[in-house]
Amino acid sequence: MTAANESYAVHPAESIGCESPLIAVQNVTMRFPIPKRYREWVVTPLQRRHVFTALSNANLEVQTGDRIAVMGPNGAGKTTLLKLIAGALLPTEGKVLVNGHSTFEQNAATRRSVGFVFNEERSFFWRLTGAQNLEFFGSLDNLHGKQLRERIEYVLELVGMKDARDKLVYTYSSGMKQRLAIARVLIAEPDVFILDEPTRALDPVACDELVELILSTIHRNSRKTLLVATHRPEEASMLCTKVVVVGKGNILGSKSIEDLDAKGISVLEYYRQVMVNREQL
C-alpha cells in the first residue's frame, strides 16, 4: 500500500474509545419481503416471496457524546440503519443495544432514549397548530398538564418557533416544519438525536439556519449524542465529529473527522476513496 493510500485506509466499523458504548449494532442484517405482483399470486401462489437485504452483517459502536454523520448513496441502507438504532425497525438477524438494552426485548425502554427526527412532512397533523401537534405528541411521551405546557413553550423558544405556535402546520414552510420536528423530539429529552437528511428539502439559507439550530441544541448538553444521515460533506464537517460510510447494505468505513483534518483529507475525499475501494473489492 502506498503512502497516499494509507491516508485513506478504510477501517470497517471502527470502534473509537474503550468505554462501554451507548449504542452497539452487532452483526445486524435487515431483510424486507418484496411484495408479489398479481400475476405471481395467481401463477405461483405457494411460492415464497423474494426478500431484499437492506443491511448485511453491520457492526457499529457509538459512544456517549459522539456526533456521527452517516453517508452513502441512495438505497445504501442509511435510513434502515438509523431506524434500527431508533427501534422503529427490528433486525432480522443480530441485535441492537441502546444503553445495554436490546431494541428487540426492551423496545419501549430503548425508544424512550432515542429521538428520531423524520424528514417527512406528513408526520404532522396539518389542520392543527404547531403547539397542538406538540401537545399531542408530548402526551404520547406521558407528559401532561402544566409540565407539558411548560415543556412546549421551552422547546418552541429553543427552535425559534414561539411566534408561529398558533399557526396551522399546513401554512408552515419546509424549514419551519423541520424546526417543529426537532421541537417534537426535544420534548421527551432523549439521550440520542437521529436526523434523516434534515436539510434535503431546504433552500441554502434555511439549510444554514437549521445547521446552526442543531449545533446550538446539541452543544447545550455536550453529552448528547447525534447521528445524522446526509449527502452533504460540508454538513457532515459542520455537525459531526465522525463519519460512517454505508454502501450496498454494508458499513464500509468509519473515521474521526479530526483524524482526516490532521492528514489534510476532506470528508468528500474520504467518502470517495471508501466508495472506490468498495467497487474494487
Predicted regions span which residues?
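Conserved ABC transporter NBD signature motif
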Residues: 94-104, 110
